[in-house]
A protein has these predicted regions:
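Phosphate- and other anionic-substrate recognition elements at nucleic-acid/protein interfaces
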Residues: 1-146
C-alpha cells in the first residue's frame, strides 16, 4: 500500500463472534481496542458492510439485516469512545463481493471453508486495502494518525 513494491498480505487472522448482536458489537469494539494497545500507535480501520439497495431483494429473513444493525451499534460505540482510536467505514457489499470473488479468495489462499460471515469479512478487508492502495486520501481516512 505504501511505496511502489508489489502488495502482499503478510499476515492475517480471523474469527467469528456469535450470540446477540449487541454482544457481538461490544466484542468487536473490545478487539479493536486490544489490537491498538498491543501492536499499534493508532487504532485499526473497522470496515462494515453498507446496505445496498437491490430491487430484487425480497428476503424476510431478519438475519439479512444483521450487518445494518451491527453497523449502527458500532457507530454508537464509536461516538461513545468505545472503539479507541479506530476509524469506522462503511463499504458496499456488492463492491466487496465483486472485488474478492470466491475464485479470487481461493487463488490468493484466503478461502475459509464453512463460514460465509468470515469470507464476507475477508472480502471487505481486501477490498478496503485495495481501495487504499489506489487512493492515498482513503489511506488517510482509514488511518488518520499515521
Amino acid at each position: 500500500m505504501y511505496g511502489d513494491g508489489p502488495s502482499q498480505i503478510v499476515e492475517h487472522d480471523y474469527g467469528e463472534f456469535n450470540g446477540p448482536e449487541a454482544g457481538q458489537s461490544i466484542e468487536i469494539a473490545r478487539l479493536a481496542r486490544e489490537i491498538q494497545s498491543l501492536d499499534y500507535k493508532t487504532g485499526p480501520a473497522v470496515i462494515c458492510e453498507a446496505w445496498d439497495q437491490d430491487p430484487r431483494f425480497h428476503s424476510t429473513d431478519p438475519e439479512t439485516l444483521s450487518p445494518v444493525r451491527i453497523g449502527a451499534q458500532l457507530e454508537l460505540l464509536l461516538e461513545q469512545g468505545q472503539l479507541g482510536d479506530s476509524t469506522l467505514h462503511f463499504q458496499s457489499r456488492s463492491l466487496a463481493f465483486s472485488t474478492a470473488t470466491d475464485d479470487r479468495l481461493h487463488k490468493w489462499g484466503l478461502w475459509v471453508a464453512g463460514s460465509t460471515h468470515i469470507r464476507a469479512a475477508l472480502r471487505h478487508a481486501i477490498t478496503a486495502l485495495r481501495r487504499a492502495r489506489e487512493n492515498p486520501d482513503f489511506i488517510k481516512e482509514l488511518w488518520p494518525y499515521n
